UniProtKB/Swiss-Prot annotation:
Lineage of source species: Bacteria, Bacillati, Actinomycetota, Actinomycetes, Mycobacteriales
PANTHER family registered for this protein in UniProt: DEVELOPMENTALLY REGULATED GTP-BINDING PROTEIN-RELATED, MITOCHONDRIAL RIBOSOME-ASSOCIATED GTPASE 2
Keywords, in A-Z order: Cytoplasm, GTP-binding, Hydrolase, Magnesium, Metal-binding, Nucleotide-binding
Family the entry assigns: Belongs to the TRAFAC class OBG-HflX-like GTPase superfamily. OBG GTPase family.
One Pfam family in the UniProt entry: DUF1967
Segments forming domain OCT: 359-437
GO MF annotations, alphabetized: GTP binding; GTPase activity; magnesium ion binding
Gene source species: Mycolicibacterium gilvum (strain PYR-GCK)
Protein name in UniProt: GTPase Obg
Amino acid sequence: MPRFIDRVVVHARAGNGGNGCASVHREKFKPLGGPDGGNGGRGGSVVFVVDPQVHTLLDFHFHPHVVAPSGKQGAGSNRDGAAGADLEVKVPDGTVVLDERGQILADLIGAGTRFEAAAGGRGGLGNAALASRARKAPGFALLGEQGEVRELTLELKTVADVGLVGFPSAGKSSLVSTISAAKPKIADYPFTTLAPNLGVVSAGEHTFTVADVPGLIPGASEGRGLGLDFLRHIERCAVLVHVVDCATLEPGRDPISDIEALEAEIAAYTPTLQGDSTLGDLAERPRAVVLNKIDVPEARELADFVREDVETRFGWPVFEISTVAREGLRPLIFALWDMVAAYRAAQPAAVPRRPVIRPIPVDETAFSVVPDGQGGFVVKGTRPQRWVAQTNFDNDEAVGYLGDRLARLGVEDELLKLGARPGCAVTIGDMTFDWEPQTPAGVDVHLSGRGTDVRLEQTDRVGADERKAARKARRQSDDGEE
C-alpha cells in the first residue's frame, strides 16, 4: 500500500535567464555592420498543476527539489536565445501552498488549476538592444537574471462530501470499507488508520465521497495523538459524522461524552483556510451521529438507551448500525446523501474563479545608502542590485556602463553626500568593489557615451564629392602641362 503523505516542504528553483550576446555583424563590403548580438532567453518557471490522478504528495517526500530549465544564450545575427520550458509539477486536488512565513499563496481546487510557484529569470540584453545614438557599437552584453528560488510548504486537505470523525477503534474504517469499495487497513488496536481513506458511496443513482479521518482524542487540537496532522482533512467536508463505539469498555466513556469531547476539539481547531468559501464555517456544517457495533448485545442496549438523549441534546439525526452484520447501512447512506444534497442546495452558487492579479508595489527607482561601520557603504535597492547581477565584471566597458547607470540613478551623488572617499568599499548585492567617483566632488557629472566605435567618428574619410573634385583638378593640371 503506498504511503500517504499530506505535508511536504518543496524547494522550487526557476530557470535562470540566458546571457545576452556581444557580436558585430560581419559581411563582405560592410565594414561597419554594427552590433547584432541577440538577447538571452527567459528561464523556465515552476508551475503547480492539479491532476485528478494524483492523490498524495509522496513524490515530493522523496524528491523535494524542483528545478526548471534555464534559458539559452543569445547569438550573433540578432538571434535570441530559446526560452526555458516551464516545468509543470502535478499536485493532487485540494493542495494548499504556503510560503516560508506560513501565509497561504494558493488553494488549488479543480482539475487543471495552475499556480506559478517560482518565476523564471529574464534574459539579458544583447549588444544590439543596448546600442543607442551615444553608444553605437557596445562591446558588451548583459547577463541573464537569476530565477526565483522559494521554499514552499504543500498541504493536502482531503476533498470529500462526508467526513467520519471519532475516537480510535470506533469503526470508521470498517464503515468506509462496508459502504464503498475502499479497502483501508482494519485492526483491533488504536490508531490503525494513519492516513485518510476516501471512498465513493452510491445512493441509488447519486454518488458522494466519504473520508475516514484517523482517530481523534482529547487534546488533538493541541497536537496530541495524531493531532493537527489530520484535523485539517475535515475542513472541506460538507457533512461531519460522529462514529461512536457503543461496545467500548474504557472507564469514563459513553456516547455523549465522546461526542462532546470531539466537538470541543473541532471547536478549538483553527482551520488554515478559515472556512472554505463554498462550504461556510466549520462550526455550521451539518452533523450526524452513528452508534456503531450494535451487533454486540450490550452495545445495542446502550445505543437504544442513549439515542433519545443524543437527539435531544445535540439535535442531530442518530443512526444505529453494525458494519459486521451490515445492519442499518442503507438508511444511513440515503440519509447522508439527503444531508449532502440539502447542504449543497443551501449554499450560494460558487462564483467562477477568475484570475486575480495582486502585484506587490515596488518602487524600482528607490535605493538607500548606509554606512557599514567599517568605512564602507552598502547600497540597497531593486535596480542597483539587479544591474550589478547583470554586469560582467570581466568586461571594462560593461563596468563603465554600470557606473553610468548608477550615476544617472543618483547613487554617486548620495555617496558623495555621505562623505565617501575614493577607494572606499561599496557593496551592492553580492559584489563589493573599490569606489572611484567619475568626477571630483562638487563638479557636475557629465556622462560620456561608452562603447562608441572610433571608426564611426573619423572625419578624414573622402566623400564622393571630394573625389570628384580631386579628379577634376588632376585633369585640369594634366591639360595645363600639355
